[in-house]
């Protein structure tokens, strides 16, 4: 009986070494010294140490000494990794070179560094930012925007706040990449990217996705949320609080727990009527469906029809640089003859 009990214990120990060894190797590879050769060498060395420890478990006289050495090595690695600090002082890509922030004077919120690039292609653009004051008492609604490029399960989500007079302010939570740095989902688990609140004109952040991103192409859907205006105001102020905090205290992006969709949900916790956490928040492409099932979108239409009407690519391409871009992409699509497939068909 003791041997039967012991086998699962050794199995769990071996599994822990295997998992921690893989994690440690990846952490060194993605977040280690900036020299790629040194990153690879350190990652390989740690992986070999984990494999040698696993091998030593089969030898009674060596296992405890090897295990103790591995635990010390892993503790050193973990201490180093936890000590990595985010920074606002790097050589940033132009699209995230400026951090947005806001000043609050009662209901009057002045947002600084609103991005509004003039695009000629995804990578060819003229940078431009502006400041604008919004009257929070004139907030009219909050839209969820879902952007798909790889099937139904994964989407980039952002919010756009609608104000009287046709003003819209979009806020997209993204990685803040350095020049020459590319995004990697796996890399995003290991603290290589800072977090950024990209506050933008819809002619920038939406038109970039509908009109210029081609490899792969992206499909954009806009849904009007059904929450109260007061909840929308609290949500806007929470976004302001978070973007201001990042300006003075940077934070890391994380692929799983600190990303474009989880942070939208975290920010929504400011309202008592927030949705409970769901696996559909992690599988972000299903967030619109989750909101629909929870009564937070227009339920007078079947969801497939609501989704069809929410697709804005054709209207955005037609509107292009028009001053009333935000109004035109939201024009009713009920009579449209276009049969845009759902993200499930992408």
What residues fall within each predicted segment?
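Activation targets extended, charge/polar-rich intrinsically disordered C-terminal tails
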Residues: 2-53, 241-346
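Cytosolic-side transmembrane helix boundary signature
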Residues: 44-71
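Internal/C-terminal transmembrane anchor helices
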Residues: 62-86
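A short, structured loop/turn motif at beta-sheet edges
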Residues: 104-108, 162-166, 227-232
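Glycine-rich catalytic cores of cysteine/serine-nucleophile enzymes that process amide/ester linkages
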Residues: 109, 114, 120-217
